[in-house]
Structures are given as C-alpha cells and as structure tokens.
Regions:
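C-terminal motif of bacterial Sec signal peptides marking the signal peptidase cleavage site
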Residues: 5-7
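Immediate post-signal-peptide N-terminus of mature secreted/exported proteins
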Residues: 14-52
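Stable alpha-helical elements in mature extracytoplasmic
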Residues: 22-25, 36, 56, 60, ...
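Glycine-rich, aromatic-bearing surface loops/beta-hairpins
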Residues: 135-179
Length: 179
C-alpha cells in the first residue's frame, strides 16, 4: 500500500486538458509548416534558386512581429519562433538537395509553383501560428507544460529525418516553457 501511495505522489503534474489541446494544435501547425519544406526544395531544385532567402525572411519577420504585437504576442518571441521555423525548413531543404545531388536526381517533372501553390499554404499557416503563439505565451508557466510539449513533439511532428528540424522548430517553445 505504501508503495502504491508513493507511486501516486511521484506522478509529475500535467497541464489542464485545454492547455494540452493548445500545445497539440501548435505542434500540428509546426508539422504542417515543415510538410511544405519538401515542396519548396523541389521547386528550388528545379529553378536553381538558393535555399537561403534572407531578404524575403526579413520581410516576413517584420510582418510577423507587427501581426504578433497586434495579437498580444511578444514580438521578439514571435520573431525568434518564426526564425526557427525558417531554419528548420531550410534544414529539410538542404538535406533533400544533398540527397538528390548524391542520387544524381534530374529536375522534377511537375514541381510545385512557389508563388501559386506553396506560399498560399504558408500564408494560411502564419496567422494560425501567431494565434497559437498567444496560447503558448499564456500557458508557458503552467506546470508540466514543458514535459507535455517534449512528449507530444516527437509524436506529432514528423520531419522524416533524425528529429533535428523538429528540435530546431520547437526550440523557442522549450526555452519559454516551465518543465
């Protein structure tokens, strides 16, 4: 009986169900955003465009900071979060380009059009991610939220590599969350 009671006392606290749902939603959105990276990689493979696009990223980050502030999200937190989303996506793109180079891959027969097919998906996800960041900001200090984030990230974010893009994408959340 004493062991049973001790075991019950050792259970780490979990966040409330509504906070778990908010964390899951954020992780699903991150996964959706990472799912776009192979499409970007295909388009850039065919066009020869560089993976790095610092001017475009800077423009997006400026707009994200403005939109985040309007949504009550700390603009520095939003900038860091989206900067890491860019980095995670570029990791996937670089790995795919390296793989295709090693395979001697010829251009794709029907690559996605960045402007017409890919950017609209990213444009749809960005405000949803900002909204989810507002939730993350609210629950960052909830006891057990960090543990829940870690547990669910591996289940909900499938980056098809070794988990490094996932780790990069959730780094700003890890830094902010209570264990």
């Amino acid at each position: 009986m004493a062991l049973l009671l001790a075991g019950c006392q050792m259970q780490p606290p979990e966040p409330p169900d509504e906070d778990k749902a908010a964390i899951d939603r954020m992780l699903v959105l991150i996964d959706e955003r990472l799912d776009v990276a192979p499409l970007v990689a295909q388009s850039k493979w065919n066009s020869g465009e560089p993976i790095e696009a610092p001017e475009r990223e800077a423009q997006i980050l400026d707009q994200v900071a403005e939109d985040a502030e309007a949504a009550g999200v700390d603009d520095a937190f939003a900038r860091r979060f989206f900067d890491k989303q860019f980095e995670a996506s570029k990791q996937v793109q670089r790995r795919l380009h390296h793989q295709w180079l090693q395979e001697g891959r010829s251009p794709f027969a029907d690559p996605p059009d960045l402007a017409e097919e890919v950017r609209p998906v990213l444009d749809r996800l960005t405000p949803q991610l900002i909204e989810a960041l507002a939730d993350m900001q609210r629950i960052a200090e909830v006891e057990g939220a960090g543990r829940y984030l870690e547990q669910r990230a591996a289940e909900l974010i499938q980056d098809d590599f070794d988990g490094e893009p996932r780790d990069v994408a959730i780094a700003p959340l890890r830094e902010r969350f209570a264990p």
